Amino acid sequence: MQRIMLRAKIHRAKVTQADLHYEGSCGIDADLLEAADIKVGEKIELYNINNGERFSTYAIQGARGSGEISLNGAAARCAHLGDLMIICTYGPMTDEEIATYTPKIVFVDEDNHFAGMKK
């Protein structure tokens, strides 16, 4: 049997841009994508800490070192600039994989730059 488990999380990232007329997606600073091992085009779940909104879209790469967290298309309606977000990915795992797996939890500073990983 497989279970859907948390694979990665970027915790408390601040929304820096919103573009309702862009085709969709969430732009994420390339440094954060790498740290969390989130791939371009991968489905992501977003949780808005400020208003409780929960929605899904896919990741696109933002400029490295920019601190970018941009919500595009319909997702732009789900948050305001400055809102804090939790960005997660999930994946199927067997009980054997779960026994030894630890999700990647990425922390950011006030400018959305990489600040460390959960130990």
From Swiss-Prot:
Residue list for modification Pyruvic acid (Ser): 25
Task: Tell me which EC number(s) this protein carries.
Answer: 4.1.1.11
What positions constitute the catalytic site?
25, 58
**In the UniProt record, does the keyword Lyase occur?**
yes
The UniProt note on the cofactor reads as follows: Binds 1 pyruvoyl group covalently per subunit.
From the UniProt record, give the pathway where this protein acts.
Answer: Cofactor biosynthesis; (R)-pantothenate biosynthesis; beta-alanine from L-aspartate: step 1/1
Report the enzyme's class at the first EC level: lyase
Question: Which UniProt keywords are given for this protein, alphabetically ordered?
Answer: Autocatalytic cleavage, Cytoplasm, Decarboxylase, Lyase, Pantothenate biosynthesis, Pyruvate, Schiff base, Zymogen
Q: Which GO terms describe its molecular function?
A: aspartate 1-decarboxylase activity
Quote the Gene3D superfamilies the UniProt record gives. 2.40.40.20
Q: What does the record give as the reaction this protein catalyses?
A: L-aspartate + H(+) = beta-alanine + CO2
Give the function comment from the record.
Catalyzes the pyruvoyl-dependent decarboxylation of aspartate to produce beta-alanine.
Annotated protein name in UniProt = Aspartate 1-decarboxylase
Native organism is Herminiimonas arsenicoxydans
